[in-house]
Curated annotation (Swiss-Prot):
Function: Transforming growth factor-beta superfamily receptors signaling occurs through the Smad family of intracellular mediators. SMAD6 is an inhibitory Smad (i-Smad) that negatively regulates signaling downstream of type I transforming growth factor-beta. Acts as a mediator of TGF-beta and BMP anti-inflammatory activities. Suppresses IL1R-TLR signaling through its direct interaction with PEL1, preventing NF-kappa-B activation, nuclear transport and NF-kappa-B-mediated expression of pro-inflammatory genes.
Any single Pfam family the record assigns to this protein: MH2
Primary localization class, coarse: nucleus
Descriptive protein name: Mothers against decapentaplegic homolog 6
GO molecular function annotation: chromatin binding; co-SMAD binding; I-SMAD binding; identical protein binding; metal ion binding; protein sequestering activity; R-SMAD binding; transcription cis-regulatory region binding
All copies of domain MH2, residue ranges: 332-495
Biological-process GO terms, alphabetical: aorta development; aortic valve morphogenesis; BMP signaling pathway; cardiac vascular smooth muscle cell development; cell-substrate adhesion; coronary vasculature development; coronary vasculature morphogenesis; fat cell differentiation
InterPro entries per UniProt: Dwarfin, MAD_homology1_Dwarfin-type, MAD_homology_MH1, SMAD-like_dom_sf, SMAD_dom_Dwarfin-type, SMAD_FHA_dom_sf, SMAD_MH1_sf
CDD domains associated with the record: MH1_SMAD_6 (cd10493), MH2_SMAD_6 (cd10499)
Sites of Omega-N-methylarginine modification: 74, 81
PROSITE patterns: MH1, MH2
Effect noted on mutating residue 74 to A: Strongly decreased methylation
Subunit structure: Interacts with NEDD4L. Interacts with WWP1. Interacts with STAMBP and PRKX. Interacts with RNF111 and AXIN1. Interacts with TGF-beta type I receptor superfamily members, including ACVR1B, BMPR1B and TGFBR1. In response to BMP2 treatment, interacts with SMAD1; this interaction may inhibit SMAD1-binding to SMAD4. Interacts with HOXC8 and HOXC9. Interacts with PELI1; this interaction interferes with PELI1 complex formation with TRAF6, IRAK1, IRAK4 and MYD88 in response to IL1B and hence negatively regulates IL1R-TLR signaling. Interacts with TSC22D1/TSC-22.
Gene behind this protein: Smad6
């Protein structure tokens, strides 16, 4: 029974992996992204289905599905006919068949020509000629058809060689993964399976394994790299791209320690330099994107006042946790939640090293934005709030403050330490799902103390994070107060 249960857990974990989705294509093309930019979308999370012409491959969960090759060319032809006509499957007359083999005879259920219905098939009525034309295979003269990444059935030697190579790589990945998972105890397998099936909603504890000399495709594959690529990021190449979250064993352990945590949801990918999307500045003169100044216009003053009201008048909001007479240890930051220009709820003081800020989380504690009520909310705010999901993990670490995007939609960050030194343009960084970014650098902040302040009110210890919507020169929203849902992180000066 013990061996049987462990084997079942290993098989469930293998079926829960994600693979690049090459069947749906890029899916995006033109159009405006949900963040308001004209650029390509960020790398989607395993459950995200947003399309977008992204350079990275979309990932999807592996679903138990009957492969096309399993029914043979005859079954594939019947399935293709059924998708085009929407009728019942009919037997295909073999070449050289007798007069009794009429193409109008319907196959009996369970017979040789019968193909059972599948929930994964798309049935289109033949009466709708437009849909039939859209679903029909394209002419060979179509350049997009020639660029199809999926080889046709029964292709030439090159396509068969590519398929055989993919099968060999898949088999090698399965062998290496099984060899690693079978080293884990039943409790560790349960923890790992819960984290994978909840998509990080229940990250669970550390899953420690000895540092093994695993190799995949002739390259070293540490446990955290192997499972991170298997369950979260199929395009992950090196372990240095991963950052352990605070509280994980690998966060405090030595880099060459005897054990390492392989829970993929105890790691995040580092957010490197990005190429910004095509700016909206080509539609407007660039002089509009100067730093805010009180003398610019009434709109500039309004936006500046809205985003700095908590700084200029901190005593306006009464919070017992922020009182200097409080006996609690000093908080290292306070979090304010805004919807456009309206602050919702009270300041949330953070005392722990890390805090979760979320809309809906299966397990855990922190700042729940879903419990903050407002009498009148616009439709854009409601839509954006529904995209917050697991939200972010904000942590204070020795080198600075980090934000980890736990949700399924990107977040957008602006911080004094992210701006270019001496630059006048507003820098807003896009953080895809599953990525982390250092939103505040303690070392760089010391240099900002002696730098000349920008025009207008300026707070060197304030970080702004917007959910799902970007702002600034590269987006249609020029100010943070135009974003439906955003956070203001007010860092305590006494660190």
């Amino acid at each position: 029974m013990f061996r049987s249960k462990r084997s079942g857990l290993v098989r469930r974990l293998w079926r829960s992996r994600v693979v690049p989705d090459r069947e749906e294509g890029s899916g995006g093309g033109g159009g405006v992204d949900e963040d308001g930019s004209l650029g390509s979308r960020a790398e989607p999370a395993p459950r995200a289905r947003e399309g977008g012409g992204c350079s990275r491959s979309e990932v999807r969960s592996v679903a138990p599905r009957r492969p096309r090759d399993a029914v043979g060319p005859r079954g594939a032809a019947i399935a293709g006919r059924r998708r085009r006509t929407g009728g019942l499957p009919r037997p295909v007359s073999e070449s050289g068949a007798g007069a009794g083999g009429s193409p109008l005879d319907v196959a009996e259920p369970g017979g040789p020509g019968w193909l059972p219905e599948s929930d994964c098939e798309t049935v289109t009525c033949c009466l709708f000629s437009e849909r039939d034309a859209a679903g029909a295979p394209r002419d060979s003269g179509d350049p997009q058809a020639r660029q199809s990444p999926e080889p046709e059935e029964g292709g030439g030697p090159r396509s068969r060689e590519a398929r055989s190579r993919l099968l060999l790589l898949e088999q090698e990945l399965k062998t290496v993964t099984y060899s690693l998972l079978k080293r884990l105890k039943e409790r560790s397998l349960d923890t790992l399976l819960e984290a994978v099936e909840s998509r990080g909603g229940v990250p669970g504890g550390c899953v420690l394994v000895p540092r093994a000399d695993l190799r995949l495709g002739g390259q070293p594959a540490p446990p955290q790299l192997l499972l991170g690529r298997l369950f979260r990021w199929p395009d992950l190449q090196h372990a240095v791209e991963l950052k352990p979250l605070c509280g994980c064993h690998s966060f405090t352990a030595a880099a060459d320690g005897p054990t390492v945590c392989c829970n993929p949801y105890h790691f995040s990918r580092l957010c490197g330099p990005e190429s910004p999307p095509p700016p909206y500045s080509r539609l407007s003169p660039p002089d509009q994107y100067k730093p805010l100044d009180l003398s610019d216009s009434t709109l500039s003053y309004t936006e500046t006042e809205a985003t700095n009201s908590l700084i200029t008048a901190p005593g306006e909001f009464s919070d017992a946790s922020m009182s200097p007479d409080a006996t609690k240890p000093s908080h290292w930051c306070s979090v304010a939640y805004w919807e456009h220009r309206t602050r919702v709820g009270r300041l949330y003081a953070v005392y722990d090293q890390a805090v979760s800020i979320f809309y809906d989380l299966p397990q855990g504690s922190g700042f729940c934005l879903g419990q903050l009520n407002l009498e009148q909310r616009s439709e854009s705010v409601r839509r954006t709030r529904s995209k917050i999901g697991f939200g972010i993990l904000l942590s204070k670490e020795p080198d600075g403050v980090w934000a980890y995007n736990r949700g399924e939609h990107p977040i957008f960050v602006n911080s004094p330490t992210l701006d270019a030194p001496g630059g006048r343009a507003l820098v807003v960084r896009k953080v895809p799902p599953g990525y982390s970014i250092k939103v505040f650098d303690f070392e760089r902040s010391g240099l900002l103390q002696h730098a000349d302040a920008a025009h207008g009110p300026y707070d060197p210890h304030s970080v702004r994070i917007s959910f799902a919507k970007g702002w600034g020169p590269c987006y249609s929203r020029q100010f943070i107060t135009s974003c439906p849902c955003w956070l203001e992180i007010l860092l305590n000066n006494h660190r």
